[in-house]
From Swiss-Prot:
Family membership noted in the UniProt record: Belongs to the HupF/HypC family.
InterPro entries: Hydgase_assmbl_chp_CS, Hydrogenase_HupF/HypC
Gene Ontology terms, MF aspect: carbon dioxide binding; iron ion binding
Protein name (database record): Hydrogenase expression/formation protein HupF
Swiss-Prot/TrEMBL GO biological process terms: protein maturation
Amino acid sequence: MCIGIPMRVVVGSEFIAQCERHGAISSISLMLVGPQAPGTHLLTHLGSAIRVLDADEARAIDDALAGLAEAVEGRAFDMLFADLISREPELPPHLRGE
């Protein structure tokens, strides 16, 4: 399983951006997504941006990763999965058999 990490562009160039997550700065390749402006949210994996995110998507992914960390530590994590609590999961259209 691969895990994508949301990061925010601080300084971008044509092929590389300096991106921030929780105060840590990393150099991220932009070869798959093209040049991005400062403030843009990116989904990253192994030093490469793989998708541009909006702020809500970045926050939801960051919350999910924090929830996993809380679960591993044996702490409460429901508040970090607000989009999933109190609703039935839905199958994607291609699995519904409609």
